[in-house]
């Protein structure tokens, strides 16, 4: 899986960062999934190779506007781009009427079926490539993290099973390797039944706003990547005395170290943290605080940067 960050700022955009939106991209092909959709997300997409037509589902972590105000525009543009395949939108039930009424009030026609699913009732979402589950977080409003787990990654033909069942090597094997259904000796064989993963599935957790990383203790075990907010540094919280339901870089880093998280990606940075290291406070303060508590692979997400999770389990920037 790849991650492409479309927005990494908390609350409001800055000149360098837009508000929250993260693309999770399938290992093979161009299909992708969107976690959160802050205002301006569709404009950020124009600077990436991602197509709205290839978007398979949208997941919204909570109701705050910096995570969802981009939805109406994105949906309208999806319709104008010629999308016709159904789109599933998993979001808090409190936003369902807001989405519907916004489309109606603006006389927006969607040439595709929009399926609204309540995140509060989501036990599991899946297709042939991924399984998605939720973990409850702690914020001023209900918030969740989404756990993306690959299904049957990089499938290879189970030749031992084929030989054991007496299915001769030849064109049938080629069809089954594509996942197609074929006929053999009067029986229909589903290609998916003869495919097995060639490596362990990868698991990526993309979190909404959260002031208690320990809530991730169970799902973080064995996860390949944890994407978590680091809105503040400890120094700022000690000076202001408030967190507004958010985490510090230190708190997230301590948790990730204790949980054995191999790749930690911090995002959702307060607009006060400048990109220029000569300014104070700056984004290097966030990095330094996290590195003081975490010894794994640390990444501070950047807008429009794509990251690839390699076979060696390391998350690296692309390009």
Curated annotation (Swiss-Prot):
Q: How is the cofactor bound?
A: Binds 2 Zn(2+) ions.
Question: Can you tell me which residues bind Zn(2+) 1?
Answer: 62, 64, 139, 209
Enzyme kind, highest EC tier: hydrolase
Transmembrane spans:
none
Query: Which keywords describe this protein according to UniProt?
Result: Endonuclease, Hydrolase, Metal-binding, Nuclease, tRNA processing, Zinc
Please verify whether the record's keywords include Hydrolase: yes
- Active site at which residues? 66 (proton acceptor)
Needed cofactors: Zn(2+)
* GO molecular-function terms, A-Z: 3'-tRNA processing endoribonuclease activity; zinc ion binding
Q: Tell me yes or no: is Nuclease among this UniProt entry's keywords.
A: yes
Q: Which domain of life is it from?
A: Bacteria
Please list the residues that bind Zn(2+) 2. 66-67, 209, 268
Write down the chemical reaction(s) this protein catalyses: Endonucleolytic cleavage of RNA, removing extra 3' nucleotides from tRNA precursor, generating 3' termini of tRNAs. A 3'-hydroxy group is left at the tRNA terminus and a 5'-phosphoryl group is left at the trailer molecule
Its EC number(s):
3.1.26.11
Write down the InterPro entries for this protein, in alphabetical order. Metallo-B-lactamas, RibonucZ/Hydroxyglut_hydro, RNase_Z/BN
Alphabetical list of HAMAP family matching this protein: RNase_Z_BN
- What quaternary structure, including any partners, is listed in this protein's UniProt entry? Homodimer.
Q: Give the protein family.
A: Belongs to the RNase Z family.
Role according to the record: Zinc phosphodiesterase, which displays some tRNA 3'-processing endonuclease activity. Probably involved in tRNA maturation, by removing a 3'-trailer from precursor tRNA.
| Protein name per its UniProtKB record | Ribonuclease Z
**Chain's gene name:** rnz
């Amino acid at each position: 899986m790849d991650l492409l960050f479309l927005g990494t700022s908390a609350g409001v955009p800055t000149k360098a960062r837009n508000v929250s939106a993260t693309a999770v991209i399938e290992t093979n092909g161009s299909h992708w999934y969107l976690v959160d959709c802050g205002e301006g997300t569709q404009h950020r997409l124009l600077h990436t190779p991602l197509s709205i037509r290839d978007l398979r589902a949208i997941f919204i972590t909570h109701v705050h506007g910096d995570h969802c105000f981009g939805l109406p525009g994105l949906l309208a543009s999806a319709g104008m781009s010629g999308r016709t395949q159904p789109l599933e939108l998993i979001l808090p039930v409190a936003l369902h009427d807001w989405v519907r009424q916004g489309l109606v009030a603006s006389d927006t026609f969607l040439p595709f079926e929009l399926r609204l699913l309540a995140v509060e009732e989501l036990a599991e979402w899946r297709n042939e490539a991924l399984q998605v589950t939720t973990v409850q977080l702690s914020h001023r409003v209900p918030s969740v993290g989404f756990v993306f787990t690959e299904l049957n990654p990089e499938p290879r033909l189970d030749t031992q099973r084929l030989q054991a069942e007496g299915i001769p090597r030849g064109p049938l094997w080629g069809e089954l390797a594509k996942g197609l259904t074929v006929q053999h000796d009067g029986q229909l064989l589903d290609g998916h039944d003869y495919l097995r993963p060639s490596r362990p599935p990868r698991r990526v957790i993309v979190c909404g706003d959260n002031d208690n990383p320990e809530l991730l203790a169970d799902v973080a075990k064995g996860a390949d990547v944890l994407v978590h907010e680091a809105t503040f540094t400890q120094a700022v919280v000690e000076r202001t005395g408030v967190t507004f339901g958010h985490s510090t870089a230190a708190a997230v880093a301590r948790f990730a170290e204790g949980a054995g998280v191999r790749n930690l990606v911090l995002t959702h940075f307060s607009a006060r943290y400048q990109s220029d290291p000569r300014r104070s406070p700056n984004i290097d303060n966030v990095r330094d605080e996290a590195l003081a508590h975490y010894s794994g692979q640390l990444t501070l997400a950047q807008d429009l940067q794509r990251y690839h999770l390699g076979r060696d389990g390391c998350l690296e920037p692309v390009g």
